[in-house]
Amino acid sequence: MAVGKVVVSVASLLLVVGVAIGVITFVNKGGGANGDSNGPINSHQKAVQTICQSTTDQGSCAKTLDPVKSDDPSKLVKAFLMATKDAITKSSNFTASTEGGMGTNMNATSKAVLDYCKRVLMYALEDLETIVEEMGEDLQQSGTKLDQLKQWLTGVFNYQTDCLDDIEEVELKKIMGEGISNSKVLTSNAIDIFHSVVTAMAQMGVKVDDMKNITMGAGAGGAARRLLEDNDSKGLPKWFSGKDRKLMAKAGRGAPAGGDDGIGEGGGGGGKIKATHVVAKDGSGQFKTISEAVMACPDKNPGRCIIHIKAGIYNEQVRIPKKKNNIFMFGDGATQTIITFDRSVKLSPGTTTSLSGTVQVESEGFMAKWIGFKNTAGPLGHQAVALRVNGDRAVIFNCRFDGYQDTLYVNNGRQFYRNIVVSGTVDFIFGKSATVIQNSLILVRKGSPGQSNYVTADGNEKGAAMKIGIVLHNCRIIPDKELEADKLTIKSYLGRPWKKFATTVIIGTEIGDLIKPEGWTEWQGEQNHKTAKYIEFNNRGPGAATTQRPPWVKVAKSAAEVETYTVANWVGPANWIQEANVPVQLGL
């Protein structure tokens, strides 16, 4: 066979999966699939068994597909996706009816969280429509897209968990959990189906690649999507287009380093870049607020909307809706252009974790450089996010994020951060995305009296095989100036498992002596550590000693053990966005 891509139909791949994992039931001596004596199962039942065997909830999967009178795996998969779409629609309608039924008994926070639930469920529907559209009518020639479609399905699942994660009122959380449980189960099963196919393809040596320049249709919101391709020779993801590479280069050209090791500091003034919109507090730009500039960007933009935010302190909360895709913001330096706001769950009525964010990115293709993001609520405000990113393919360079609890919310999609500073106390890097933070400075702060510090809190609740998790590569984890004197008495940990399959990997990183010898800790009242995945490899510094790590933390001995978590494999296919001088080369 000639070397090159092998394009395989979904139908044939699903049959391969059935054989590969040994799930097709062969009937002997007239026995049924379950060992009964009701006669041999028909071809439809065999196909359903094949598809459903690898799912988390096989009973639900079979029940969904039983009414589909076909043995064509392609038709069954599409029918499953359509059933998932119907279930999410019902979840959205249930949310609206729940809100309406509460009437005057609903407080400001309940109103806010239910409105947020309606919004993210609509996003889930839009993405699911995209998935169905990209698979086509006959689902043929889809083999090369399956890994990407699985990533989008993971986002659909995360949108539904977002809703529940933001609800703190016990009774409302129970009501909503029951109301949207069916759509969560179906979405989870859909991810499992795609994962099995992709795994089988990899085992066969079939290349799982993404099609180029796939564009969403109007039914899915119309926002342009550019999928991943192969690795770039200069260390940039191929989904990071040539034009975007030039924009990033120009935005940083001639920028002096400064501050903490030059990370996240300095300024560029935009170099030779030509902004689409200019924001300036002194009136020298087209807009005085960032929100105005965002709303002036085109909806469903196939190109790039470029916003230059001139030096100044912008006291505003900025939300970038899903339809405002492909926005690139750049400032005049992370300590010169600062977006700040004071909003928190504890001190701001009608606020949830997601809604506390100073900047809230809900769109694809977001880029930022030379900007500071702050939430000034303080430690008494509890959850208070500086930046929340829900959109896929986020690339952020030379920025700074300051807060206390929940500073940086890496909540969905694939995200890459390079040369940033992020400060905080409790769970201050957290979320449910595939995120790599590289060559960055992580400052642990002093919080409320008696409060411990946790750098990370990953929220993977789907499964250990999913690309959901936080990777810190070639970073520095040290105390800030206020914590320095008390760094050995205040307990600080690398992280704790927010959800059942929490995944966090630390590679080639300097870990200061502020980190307790055990390194990691359990989530109070939960058993998530038993199924979580924590890996350390080739770290350095006094806090990197692993002799007292708990047994559920893996200390990798070779690069091969962490190859999955390179930029190329975790947020790719991709290569390093910039070369990093680390003692181990990953992805070789």
UniProtKB/Swiss-Prot annotation:
Q: Gene of origin?
A: VGDH2
As for subcellular location, the record says:
Secreted, Cell wall
What is this protein's record name?
Probable pectinesterase/pectinesterase inhibitor VGDH2
Pathway assigned to this chain's UniProt record: Glycan metabolism; pectin degradation; 2-dehydro-3-deoxy-D-gluconate from pectin: step 1/5
Does the record bear Phosphoprotein in its keywords?
no
Q: Where is this site: Transition state stabilizer?
A: Q405
Species this protein is from: Arabidopsis thaliana
Q: Which residues are glycosylated?
A: N93, N107, N213, N231
Where is the stretch described as Pectinesterase inhibitor VGDH2? 42-193
Signal peptide positions (record): 1-22
Keyword Cell wall biogenesis/degradation (UniProt): yes
Pfam families for this protein = Pectinesterase, PMEI
EC numbers for this chain:
3.1.1.11
Record's catalysed reaction(s): [(1->4)-alpha-D-galacturonosyl methyl ester](n) + n H2O = [(1->4)-alpha-D-galacturonosyl](n) + n methanol + n H(+)
